[in-house]
Swiss-Prot record:
This is UPF0246 protein Rsph17029_0026. Belongs to the UPF0246 family. GO terms for biological process: response to hydroperoxide. GO terms for cellular component: cytosol. It comes from Cereibacter sphaeroides (strain ATCC 17029 / ATH 2.4.9) (Rhodobacter sphaeroides).
Length: 257
């Protein structure tokens, strides 16, 4: 079983992660593609970044500086799970994983990225902001989806072949999972859905759902899951499996609001 997560917009101010002696930070397997994208992004102005990603002027200026230094500042790279600091990563809590779970996560948890394509948790990355939905024109097309094409799906296929995984658990957002070309992907996909019930209404509450996606990835890693039916035992954040709302491809987890 593989699990995929979205990255985080918010980055840790002081990234830190204690690793066991036999587990070292790794290098992104699609680093050459990231370098190519960074060269394109390096030519963008702060106004360009504001327009493309709807971000503030200070954040746009910060990322202009980051892309300008991207190829010279490789020594500033840190493991992805240490750098990402959003709600999903609060649910994952990689800093508190034991050594065995972290080793398993390194092999079976994948992080989708607009800049790096596909990451392992311990892949060393540099601070950046480049969302997958960005309409950044490259020689491959008008968007990052065009740039990545089937490369992310093929990278997932390769990870599955290496690990023996037979199913992909999609804990990513629609924006990011769209980058995994389903026609090229050789794995069946299971997409857990996290709903909150309040006043008789059931709906996705973004904050809790993002945390639950990270917690689901942690649950998979800690228990080294391979059988999709074992996902039903997930209980973090007050969520519980709801069989009446679920299908095999879309298990639903419900919490009281």
């Amino acid at each position: 079983m593989l699990a995929v997560l979205s990255p985080a917009k918010r980055l840790a101010a002081r990234p830190a992660l204690d690793l066991p002696a036999d587990l070292a930070p790794s290098e992104p397997r699609l680093q050459d593609q990231a370098d190519a994208l960074a060269r394109v992004a390096r030519d963008l102005t702060a106004a360009d970044l504001r327009r493309l990603m709807h971000i503030s002027e200070p954040l746009a200026r910060l990322n202009v500086a980051r892309f300008a230094e991207f190829h010279e500042a490789r020594n500033a790279a840190v493991p992805a799970v240490a750098l990402f600091d959003g709600d999903t990563y609060a649910g994952l809590e990689a800093r508190t994983m034991d050594a065995d779970a972290l080793r398993w996560a390194q092999e079976r948890i994948c992080i989708l990225s607009g800049l790096y394509g596909l990451l392992r948790p311990l892949d060393r990355i540099q601070p950046h902001r480049l969302e997958m939905g960005t309409r950044l024109a490259t020689e491959r097309g008008a968007t990052l989806y065009d740039f990545w094409g089937d490369r992310i799906a093929e990278a997932l296929n390769a990870r599955a072949a290496e690990t023996g995984a037979r199913v992909l658990v999609n804990c990513a957002s629609v924006e990011y999972f769209t980058a995994a070309d389903r026609a090229a992907l050789k794995l069946p996909v299971i997409t857990p859905t996290f709903l909150e019930e309040r006043n008789g209404e059931r709906k996705v509450v973004s904050f809790w759902a993002k945390r639950a996606r990270g917690a689901m990835a942690r649950f998979i890693a800690e228990n080294r899951l391979d059988d999709p039916e074992d996902l039903r035992a997930f209980r973090a954040g007050g969520y519980a499996y709801e069989p009446d709302l679920s299908t095999d491809e879309r298990p639903v987890f419900l919490r009281a609001g």
